[in-house]
Amino acid sequence: MSHRCVLAVVVLAFAAGWCMCDVGDFAPCLQFFYKSWPPKGLAGTPICQRHINQYVFATLYCRPRRSPWFSAYLYSAPAGKRPTASWKFEPQLAYPAADGNMIPFPPGPLDQNVVDSQAVEPDYINSTYSRGHLNPSLHHKSHENRSATFTLTNVVPQKSGSNDGPWEDLEQTVNRTLGAYCLGEAFVVTGSIPYQNDKHWLHNHRVAVPEYMWSAYCCPNYTDNLPEKLKDAFPTFAAIGRNDRNSTEEIVPVDKTAKKQFRGYDVKRMPLETLEMYLKDRFSTVVSVFYEQCSGSD
């Protein structure tokens, strides 16, 4: 789609008053949260991520940081090859009355409202950070759903030493574990943790860089014959990963024997309660990821 066509879609949608309320309310996509209960304690702009007229996952977006606090989704075992990246943006962040389907970035200049409202591709060009998925394509079955994860509203600046190393290993581990032992729906929430001083940004205060990434899943219905090493991985599992090799080791220690390119980007697995303790400490408020900590009670 040309730059002119993208502008026409956005402007016509605004003029016509189309609004599916995909931005500003999680109500249309509560199915991606355990017990229809979004995480509590974090403030931001809810996005029901819609691709080809289907809701695929949910994101809590921080407009001032131009990056997500978390993305929430239902795990499904992947099929086929990883899609070729076709990066997209959220039109309703720029124009609230626009159509809610994510749109591929056009070649050439972008509408300034889009640039002002969210991260755009030039933010990552010539930076030392990769585009780190919160909701990874690996955790989805259909090609369409996997393709939908390639939106910059689902991405944080992530060091390649993390993205291509320990964090990728975590995503693969979660994929194998849920695929083999989760018998029902598996709800996953993956998010970012800011620096305490919040002074790390891309391109002159355009996009905030997180110090850590975190992830947790809730699978209330799982097999009875779990391997001994996985008995503490159900019904919940959580982890925090380093995104700065120079961060202190209070939260995640460093394995000094790791390969040089991955050293300092360790991932620490922990109980859900421990993750929420670290989130409370960094965000200075109680953060609850799952309803009743995925206890299954009503």
Residue ranges of model-derived segments:
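Domain-level detector of nuclease and nuclease-like folds
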Residues: 109-298
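Residue-level detector of bioactive/disordered segments in secreted/extracellular proteins
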Residues: 7, 21-23, 31, 50, ...
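Signal-peptide-cleavage-adjacent N-terminal segments of secreted and extracellular proteins
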Residues: 19-70
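Short, His- and charge-rich active-site/binding loops that engage polyanionic ligands
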Residues: 51-130
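Residues that form ligand- and interface-recognition hot spots within folded domains
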Residues: 5, 63, 76, 138, ...
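Extracellular secreted precursors and ectodomains with disulfide-bonded cysteine-rich loops/domains
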Residues: 17-19, 27, 46, 157, ...
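Cleavable N-terminal signal peptides of Sec/SRP-targeted secreted and luminal proteins
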Residues: 2-21
